[in-house]
């Protein structure tokens, strides 16, 4: 077989893209359960569908078409001699009928390709096949689509470790697909699923003549011909892999291959290809050598990445979090909380004496930020829009960095800083006073002793005294701007205002914070001590003022052994709405919208203290809304469902890991018939979505307009809504994403990130079915700029990328 791949012009590609954009994506009932699993059966029909694949990546990620894929998105990765390779293990598949083993070099890759060719009864030129094996070697891929069960059997034999959302049991029947655990979040498969489903595949690259290097002229020439070896080899590989996966379909009854393959040719990438098709233009190397004097970005490539919506979800998550947690002053305290980027930018601006307008708005976001032009003469104009610029007119004197590997500062160091503060010359100098402090979640009640409590008290005292010196402020920060600073921040708010822990959390809540159960326990026991030394007590304030006025360098706070002992006998009031929670407070997504768990909804006093007036219960029943006859069965008595391994959302979380969410096992015997019931109870308006489970098949969006109308009516009357399910990561997160799409008039990817970032350390995980419903709903109601539409598989690729660090 000699594969002849026709060439198409950029204009013809544009026509194919228009047909694809106008095409109707398959209905949910046809897309699923096929999209959930590796491929045992035929894909749904999707007439006029198009996938674009780049055959050769560029080092600087330029020359990218919109909605285009790369080979690593489609093919299974090839890992050679990893730590999982046991000595003497031949890595055979365990299924002798497959007749192949895991390849460890190009020759074995070639043998694997030859095996596939024999199975398909094809005749392929030896040179072409050798080129395909070399291509696989160069790109570290196996000649299998990610959805091919036989390719996965190779990987599973040598790499048996489970990953979040992955399935390690291969079965030939699709009948049990709904019952398999962890299967309904395979976003990583959807690019390969798209390749398997589409009618047309267009291949391109930025290869110029005989070299894959870019031209260096300011307007790089990039002539791309139909005989490009990269593109023709990829076309052959795609044809073999598509036919091979189709051969494994259950009950296919013959050849199904129907995909049209094309290679796009052009003389100049930037001028020949319509601008609506270009995600990132071909850029010369000089562009990437320019550096901003602010150094806010590592290179101008971040501006390029931001402008390409197809490839920027990881970057946008970082930028959105930076905006959300940027430096803000807490009321009248003299304490500013922020993130590492704030401190970095503050130093750069001050050091270089750069005149840059302070930019900060509460609830600021990059969601509606348009494409940025990179001005080499004035780079800060565009780059500064990606960040909230700190106010460098403020004097940040005391700098406190909280990290997980920090020890408590010594009392001697704190006293030294107090001495410097009392020295006129030292206090007016530009030199900063630096402290480190242990991160939230790193101290347990059993770690406390008199010295550690005194250190915490004196750090709070130092922050207060810095604020009493004219124009001096304290900047407290950590990497993400909230996780590691929350313990010290909350302790200081209790100390400064002389308020109980519950009220302190309410004061902080407009700003992101996250307290671990151990933090709540410590603060609950320490709050009497912190309040006893609060400057809000008249005698304390006078004492602290005199220490500053008379330059008493020996003054420090001390506690008696009796007071220390009383800490451990202190009981947290049972009526405390916040401290007895098993996790964090509900996450504020918008001014009128909160996302939380069933635990939050079960606590009406907590909701009232947050100003919440409306509740949306997604598939769960709040016990206090039931009459006494029903309280014995508070959770969906009408559904055959078992919740296992709930592992409460804040229980076992570390700073860098996500929580495990509840696994759901659902009987197939009952069809979903969800409905919406609106009622009033105990002063709350309640919207109950009944009979909806997180099982990868229950539909939500036939009810979504009713739910969003309920939320909209609440917002119009000045109310606030809590949306919850069991844990607050899938069903309720889906509703919140839909509300953000409606309220912010943004696309699905932007709304997903907006909610994800504001859920803080609780990682949202809407199942694949819900996200596809969101996609279809957005296409129907809000897809006004089709040229900028992000395809389903591209959105899934982005979600898989931002979730990668948790797998």
Curated annotation (Swiss-Prot):
It comes from Saccharomyces cerevisiae (strain ATCC 204508 / S288c). It catalyses: O-phospho-L-tyrosyl-[protein] + H2O = L-tyrosyl-[protein] + phosphate; O-phospho-L-seryl-[protein] + H2O = L-seryl-[protein] + phosphate; O-phospho-L-threonyl-[protein] + H2O = L-threonyl-[protein] + phosphate. Coiled coil: none annotated. Protein phosphatase with specificity for serine, threonine, and tyrosine residues; has a role in the DNA synthesis phase of the cell cycle. One of its GO terms (molecular function) is protein tyrosine/serine/threonine phosphatase activity. The gene is PPS1. InterPro entries: Dual-sp_phosphatase_cat-dom, Dual_spec_PTase, PPS1_DSP, Prot-tyrosine_phosphatase-like, Tyr_Pase_AS, Tyr_Pase_dom, TYR_PHOSPHATASE_DUAL_dom. Belongs to the protein-tyrosine phosphatase family. Non-receptor class dual specificity subfamily. GO terms for biological process: nuclear DNA replication. This is Dual specificity protein phosphatase PPS1. Its EC number is 3.1.3.16, 3.1.3.48. GO terms for cellular component: nucleus. It comes from the Eukaryota. Keywords: Cell cycle, Hydrolase, Protein phosphatase. Pfam families: DSPc (PF00782). Residues 593-807 are annotated as: Catalytic. The active site is at 725 (phosphocysteine intermediate). Residues 585-783 form the Tyrosine-protein phosphatase domain.
